[in-house]
Design a protein with these regions (language model features):
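Conserved N-terminal structural module of periplasmic/extracytoplasmic solute-binding proteins
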Residues: 6-9, 17, 21-171, 175-192, ...
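Structured alpha-helical segments in the cores of large, soluble enzyme domains
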Residues: 49-53, 260-264, 268, 331-334
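Loop/turn elements at helix/coil->beta-strand transitions in domains of secreted/extracellular proteins
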Residues: 31-35, 61-66, 88-93, 113-116, ...
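Conserved small-residue motifs centered on glycine
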Residues: 372-505
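N-terminal secretory signal peptides that target proteins for export/translocation
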Residues: 1-3
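Carboxylate/His-rich catalytic cores and anion/metal-binding grooves
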Residues: 106, 111-145, 196-199, 207-241, ...
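Helix-loop-helix "hinge/cap" segment bordering the ligand-binding cleft or interdomain interface
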Residues: 119, 148-226, 245-287, 291-294, ...
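Extracytoplasmic/periplasmic substrate-binding proteins
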Residues: 220-241, 245, 268-432
Length: 545
């Protein structure tokens, strides 16, 4: 018998104050309860009703899912959710927003009573057995990351760390130029300057023109392209914002420290010697890629998180000359890299007051089942992915080849992630996948086995070179109260922009690094409210201990 469902734009109805008539299940399915789910849609999912993952959940939990689609756009989703909370009519039981809600919005919706607090349920193995089966350390990370400033947890999280994304400022040097000039790979900032001088003066690209760019990057890039950030980490840990003291007790502003000034002095010297391009601060992403891919290679050193900056990377002659190197050591032995600590994203919420609370909790907990999580992310087992030992035989990946893991856990065997499909919800929803699970997957959808000689297979090398290069104590994502957010709202916007601007000005000489210039900079930061930001951040950090 055909199943009857409704896929409705509930948010629009809520905005107009209209009611929505419930669906009467087919007679043969009357024993099944119906769960109303508001779900952020994906343009790449062609059908949610006749969808493999939908049917998997319905059959396993013996339920009917009634969909209310939220927009794919994050801003539109936030608007719709606010309208729903305001109208308080035709509410779903559960909501999945694909991480589109900000921490401030989650706290506000929880504080107002729209989202149900989840603390007691998450900590009860009888209510959420799958969640409580997560290894203790990972489960504690999830609980800590999702605890809001009021002490409550309102969202079920997706936990699926990938080391490649944690350290995107990977440094690449032109190895062909090093070889031509008889130079070794630099390991320190002083050695780098010597190499850059040789690049400048030795015509390593062989075109008879002094067109070589020593250090190049894209300061406006969001995925590792800001080379000056990478260089600063040879002097002090810089992650793009506030950080922690060495002992992990105090929130500090690294951009006010003496070591920061020393890093600026080093890069200003490179700039004055013609070894660091000022275009780092003015070029956009398109120009960045164009410079990296000139007919005659002209870049000596850059940083990038994605190899897509070199189109057709396996056959790209510019990339063929580059080699990824370790973060550089500074004069005091500092050797860090910008590091984005993994933060589990809040994905699913239960609407407070639902009369299907037990079912909603059962539904949420199912997403933390390992098999369900694999289907949620990769599709149908045996069709889109496999963990059959016979299929895994003879297969490997970069992490296994590097000896970091003994064997693969699964193979991806379809192009489901890049195709329009009705197999999954595109990984929208909570999920648990350990770091090992993520690192022991190989994408075999092309039918090509892992090639140990493929120069683009850098995941394991990046893991070894970059993942350990951060301080023991790293400032977590802070959860501010509504009052705290109001207090520092201006500082959160203006101060990071000002620091980036001054960084460029100090390096290019537009601002002086003498005592007068440095003190003027510190005074400006104070006038803009740095102390207020630090004090508020300290209070928020202390709540996490």
């Amino acid at each position: 018998m055909t199943k009857t469902k409704r896929v409705a734009a509930m948010m629009m109805a809520a905005a107009m104050g209209t009611s929505m008539i419930g669906v009467i299940p087919a007679a043969a399915e009357e024993e099944r309860e119906t769960l109303k789910l508001a779900l952020t849609q994906s343009s790449m999912v062609t059908d949610y009703e006749n969808n493999y993952f939908t049917k998997y959940l319905e059959d396993k939990l013996n339920i009917n899912i009634e969909f209310y689609m939220l927009p794919a756009d994050a801003a539109e989703t936030r608007t719709k959710v606010n309208l729903m909370a305001t109208s308080n009519e035709d509410l779903p039981d559960v909501m999945i927003t694909d991480g589109h809600l900000t921490n401030e919005m989650i706290l506000q919706l929880g504080d107002s009573g729209f989202f149900a607090p989840l603390n007691d349920y998450l900590n009860d193995p009888e209510v959420m057995p799958n969640f409580n089966a997560i290894p203790d350390e990972d489960r504690e990370d999830i609980l800590q990351a999702t605890t809001m400033a009021d002490g409550n947890i309102y969202g079920f999280a997706a936990y699926e760390p990938e080391t490649w994304n944690l350290t995107p400022n990977r440094m690449f040097i032109n190895r062909a130029w090093l070889d031509k000039l008889g130079l070794e790979v630099p390991t320190t900032t002083d050695e780098l300057k010597t190499v850059l001088e040789a690049f400048r003066d030795g015509d390593p690209n062989g075109n008879g023109v002094q067109d070589e760019i020593g250090v190049y990057g894209f300061a406006g890039g969001s995925y590792g392209e800001n080379t000056v950030d990478a260089l600063m980490n040879a002097f002090i840990f810089w992650n793009g914002g506030l950080s922690l003291s060495d002992d992990g007790t105090e929130v500090i502003a690294p951009f006010t420290q003496d070591a920061w000034r020393e890093g600026l002095t080093y890069m200003n010297d490179l700039y004055n010697e013609g070894l660091l391009s000022a275009n780092i601060f003015t070029d956009d992403g398109q120009q960045f890629k164009a410079i990296l891919n000139q007919e005659t290679p002209i870049v000596g050193l850059t940083t990038a998180g994605s190899l897509s900056n070199w189109p057709d990377v396996k056959n790209n002659k510019n990339f063929a000359e580059m080699e990824m190197i370790e973060p550089l050591k500074g004069p005091e032995g500092v050797q860090y890299t910008p590091y984005n600590p993994y933060v589990p994203g809040q994905e699913m919420y239960i609407i407070n007051g639902t009369d299907k609370l037990d079912l909603a909790l059962k539904f949420a907990d199912e997403f933390f089942n390992i098999d369900t999580g694999l289907i949620e992310r990769f599709g149908e087992e045996g069709v889109d992915w496999t963990r059959d030992p016979k299929d895994l035989e003879g297969q490997t990946n970069a992490y296994v080849e590097a000896g970091l893991y003994d064997k693969l856990s699964m193979l991806v065997i379809s192009t489901i992630w890049s195709d329009n499909q009705s197999q999954t919800w595109r990984n929208h929803g909570p999920r648990y996948a350990s770091l090992e699970m993520g690192n022991t997957v190989y994408d075999y959808s092309s039918g090509n086995k892992f090639d140990v000689n493929d120069p683009t297979q850098l995941n394991a090398k990046s893991y070894e070179m970059y993942y350990p290069k951060h301080p023991e104590n790293v400032l977590p994502a802070l959860k501010y109260t509504l009052e705290e957010t109001e207090t520092i709202q201006e500082q959160l916007t203006t101060l990071p922009t000002f620091v980036d601007q001054c960084m460029a000005e100090f390096i290019t000489g537009a601002r002086s690094l003498d005592d007068a210039g440095w003190n003027a900079y510190l005074d400006e930061l104070e006038t803009m409210g740095l102390s207020t930001w630090l004090e508020t951040a300290q209070v928020a950090y202390d709540r996490t201990k």
